[in-house]
């Protein structure tokens, strides 16, 4: 087994031969500064002398030059009852004398009062203390959320300096609740859509309750909608009686008794005018109600926005297995079709059904009051609808699932064509691809027609029942009217009511059919929301790293060292399929000191990239541990350049498109980086300047009170429905094709330098460059390490954390800048060579 000796004391090497355990807080940490309720202010908390302490003399000046930052940029906590997020803050420097820093929480995707309790306070470091902690109380609920987070910020330092890159951390709340309800945990264990179909109506009820209870503003808007729908029903009932009154009283001049029943006794003309006004004027109230509903109570956007954001956030945290289970075309269909369909047919439809049921109640009241015998269809319609839905439920969902699969296949083929168009043309496969696409389209057409045929016969049920009911009632006209069982006005009104009743029950059937249709996208979304995410694995990794760093500090207490001296440790690491780190070659055990340059040299396919993947948590080891202090930010830069096609040079190297993030310093540093890496061609600079100018102008507009919405991509037009609009094609960006292979790589490297990670891991960064460019890149690596960052002017070098570069090369390549060379060989595993001190 290859091991590395970097000159550390024996006690330190031995300390890393075992998996570090977290020491008890009572043994190494002073009592935590806890986020108590506001009435118990934290500002007066005084740490005890038993705090965790390490010292470092000579690297920083005493007193106010000590640096304070968060122990990690990300902390994790489970959303369980009485959970508290523990957030650690570290002090780096001489540790001489006291210092303090204020802290506070701030909303991000998680909101105070809903997911956590707002807290703030002051952290006091005593002489020799290097690690302190605060706690934030997490609020547990039974409602599903994808992983939400909030911020904790440091500010107002006293006798110390806050590292700008470590002044803010994210606390991720791991929600273990299930969408849309925890009641379906058993069905989701098998990840079967068929099992969800069996409980589809229960799932739909849970979704409705989820929207009502959990989506912001929906509860009060829903109640308002239900109440306002009753206005229309009241008007509808009034119009029925107006028509009966008009025929039986106002127009019945043969019956003298009607004179006394006129609104204006003895004046039929005035009464008729009053009836006309009674028919017209309430519509102004209904118009105002409709306007208020459209302007203030539009709920579709709120629910769609909530579901889309949660699914988007969930997808970003998917494991590789989960990503493979949800192809990109399925995600697109879920976002742009399934969610709008679910919201429209699975929640908003209930208000239409509520209004229709109200009208049916009005009709029932009229029928039972005027002619009870005519109310028989009131009982026939619901019975037939329930039986029909019961017997067609499964068939409908099966047809919808097949039609959805056909649509997914068509969309997926088009998306694959977009990616592989050049390859298809180069190898003359266009004919085969077109034939295959035609076959997919024919299959989709067949599936669509099956569903349409089914829906056609669905739509015939209520109209035919209504036709029969009216015909039978008309055949009884002579007996009903002439024998005095009802008046002519009531009889004619009942004929109209029968037609209205059929229309209402047709709407009810369509509504319940829509509800049953919504179960299909709901089941699909439920499965996507339940897929595994990598946040728990990242949380476990963070705990191991935190335990390692705290254990290392405990072992090294009093040795005049700081967190800058915590190495990166590969401890008996084996990967079964790795050519160089399997059980036969003995795995890898090595220490990588911060502030060093490490070259991983070896032939092709020897496993060099696996080392970088292990380092950056992209790959779990089969055995052993990779231990890294959590305060280190690691960035793995792949050999294949990655770009965002929707933005240009500026957006790609700074990874921003929001004007609020733009600053002149950002522009200047990016420009210097492009010049250093020989990326200063006129057209590149012109594009860079053009993007920067647009962002600067947008920022100026924001400063003048015209802020651009951060959620512009989700905004809709005035009618609240942009789902049916044709999607705009993304504008093609040919600038990427103008870059050479070398320029693409250097642009990616510029992005990495600008984001200034503590550990920069690169795959073959100089492999395909000429000698001149190779030296440019290597000199940048060297300055990045020695100056603790490249082209950074906002913080003195003494206040920056060390930078480390680990890069892979061919087996025979040798570079003087490397402090250590890890030689990778399938036959001998990994051997470590210490190089002579690098030339600065």
For each of these PLM feature ranges, what is it?
Residues 1-208:
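Short boundary segments that mark the start of a structured unit
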Residues 230, 351-400, 475-486:
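Transmembrane helices of ABC transporter permease
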Residues 21, 26, 30, 43-46, ...:
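Membrane-integrated ABC transporters
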Residues 402, 406, 410, 422-429, ...:
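Cytosolic ends of transmembrane helices, especially the final helix of ABC transmembrane type-1 domains
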Residues 256-260, 366-380, 450-523, 624:
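Helix-loop-helix
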Residues 309, 650-734, 778-782, 786-787:
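ABC ATPase nucleotide-binding domain helical subdomain, centered on the C-loop/LSGGQ "ABC signature"
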Residues 593, 597, 601-668, 672, ...:
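ABC ATPase nucleotide-binding domain signature region
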Residues 316-360, 419-422:
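Juxtamembrane loop-to-helix connectors within ABC transporter transmembrane domains
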């Amino acid at each position: 087994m290859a091991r590395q000796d970097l000159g550390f004391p024996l006690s330190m090497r031995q300390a890393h031969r075992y998996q570090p355990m977290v020491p008890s807080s009572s043994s190494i940490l002073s009592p935590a500064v806890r986020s108590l309720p506001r009435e118990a202010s934290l500002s007066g908390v005084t740490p005890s002398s038993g705090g965790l302490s390490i010292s470092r003399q000579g690297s920083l000046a005493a007193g106010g030059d000590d640096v304070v930052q968060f122990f990690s940029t990300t902390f994790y906590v489970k959303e369980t009852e009485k959970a508290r997020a523990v957030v650690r803050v570290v002090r780096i420097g001489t540790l001489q004398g006291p210092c303090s820093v204020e802290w506070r929480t701030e909303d991000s995707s998680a909101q105070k009062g809903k997911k956590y309790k707002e807290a703030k306070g002051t952290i006091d470091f005593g002489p020799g203390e290097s690690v302190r902690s605060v706690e934030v109380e997490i609020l547990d609920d039974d409602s599903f959320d994808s992983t939400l987070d909030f911020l904790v910020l440091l500010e107002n330092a006293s006798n110390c300096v806050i590292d700008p890159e470590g002044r803010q951390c994210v606390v991720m709340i791991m929600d273990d609740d299930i969408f849309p309800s925890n009641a379906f945990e058993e069905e989701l264990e098998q990840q079967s859509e068929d099992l969800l179909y069996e409980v589809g109506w229960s799932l739909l009820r849970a979704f409705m309750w989820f929207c009502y209870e959990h989506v912001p503003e929906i509860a009060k808007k829903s109640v308002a909608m239900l109440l306002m729908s009753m206005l229309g029903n009241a008007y509808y009932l009034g119009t029925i009686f107006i028509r009966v009154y008009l025929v039986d009283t106002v127009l019945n001049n043969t019956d003298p008794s009607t004179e006394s029943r006129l609104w204006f006794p003895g004046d039929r003309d005035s009464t008729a005018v009053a009836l006309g006004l009674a028919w017209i004027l309430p519509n102004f109230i209904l118009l105002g109600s409709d306007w208020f509903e459209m302007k203030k109570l539009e709920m579709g956007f709120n629910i769609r926005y909530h579901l889309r954001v949660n699914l988007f956030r969930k997808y970003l945290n998917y494991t590789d297995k989960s990503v493979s289970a949800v192809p990109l075309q399925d995600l697109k269909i879920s976002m742009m079709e399934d969610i709008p369909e679910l919201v429209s047919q699975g929640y908003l439809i209930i208000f239409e059904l509520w209004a229709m049921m109200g009208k049916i109640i009005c009709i029932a009241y009229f029928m039972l009051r005027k002619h009870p015998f005519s109310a028989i269809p009131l009982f026939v319609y619901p019975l037939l609808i329930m039986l029909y839905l019961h017997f067609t439920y499964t068939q409908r969902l099966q047809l919808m699932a097949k039609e959805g699969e056909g649509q997914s296949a068509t969309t997926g083929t088009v998306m694959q064509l977009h990616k592989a168009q050049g390859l298809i043309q180069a190898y003359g496969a266009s004919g085969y691809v077109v034939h295959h696409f035609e076959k997919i389209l024919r299959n989709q057409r067949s599936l669509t027609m099956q569903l349409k045929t089914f829906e056609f016969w669905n739509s015939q049920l209520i109209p035919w029942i209504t036709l029969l009911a009216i015909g039978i009632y008309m055949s009884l006209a002579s007996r009903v009217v002439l024998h005095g069982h009802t008046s002519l006005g009531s009889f004619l009104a009942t004929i109209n009511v029968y037609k209205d009743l059929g229309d209402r029950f047709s709407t009810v059937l369509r509504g319940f059919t829509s509800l049953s249709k919504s179960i299909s996208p709901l089941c699909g979304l439920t499965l996507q929301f339940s897929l595994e995410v990598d946040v728990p694995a990242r949380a476990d990794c963070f705990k191991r790293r935190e335990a390692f760093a705290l254990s290392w500090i405990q072992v090294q207490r009093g040795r005049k060292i700081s967190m800058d001296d915590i190495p990166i440790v590969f401890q008996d690491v084996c990967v079964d399929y790795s050519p160089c780190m399997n059980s036969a070659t003995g795995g890898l055990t090595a220490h990588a000191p911060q502030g060093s340059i490490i070259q991983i040299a070896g032939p092709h396919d020897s496993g060099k990239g696996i080392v970088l993947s292990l380092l950056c948590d992209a790959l779990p080891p089969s055995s052993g541990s990779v231990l890294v202090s959590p305060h280190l930010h690691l960035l793995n830069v792949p050999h294949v350049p990655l770009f965002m096609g929707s933005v240009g040079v500026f957006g790609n190297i700074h990874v921003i498109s929001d004007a609020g993030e733009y600053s002149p310093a950002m522009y200047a540093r990016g420009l210097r980086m492009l010049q250093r890496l020989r990326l200063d061609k006129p057209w590149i600079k012109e594009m860079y300047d053009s993007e920067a100018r647009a962002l600067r102008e947008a920022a100026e507009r924001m400063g003048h009170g015209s802020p651009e919405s951060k959620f512009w991509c989700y905004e809709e037009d005035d009618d609240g429905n942009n789902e049916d609009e044709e999607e705009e094609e993304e504008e093609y960006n040919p600038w990427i094709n103008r870059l050479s292979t070398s320029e693409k790589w250097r642009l990616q490297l510029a992005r990495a330098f600008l984001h200034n990670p503590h550990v920069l891991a690169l795959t073959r960064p100089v492999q395909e460059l000429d000698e001149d460019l190779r030296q440019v890149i290597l000199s940048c690596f060297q300055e990045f390490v020695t100056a603790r960052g490249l082209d950074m002017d906002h913080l003195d070098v003494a206040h920056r954390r060390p930078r480390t570069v680990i890069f892979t090369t061919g087996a025979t390549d040798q570079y003087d800048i490397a402090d250590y060379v890890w030689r990778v060989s399938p036959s001998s595993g990994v051997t470590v060579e210490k190089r002579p001190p690098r030339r600065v």
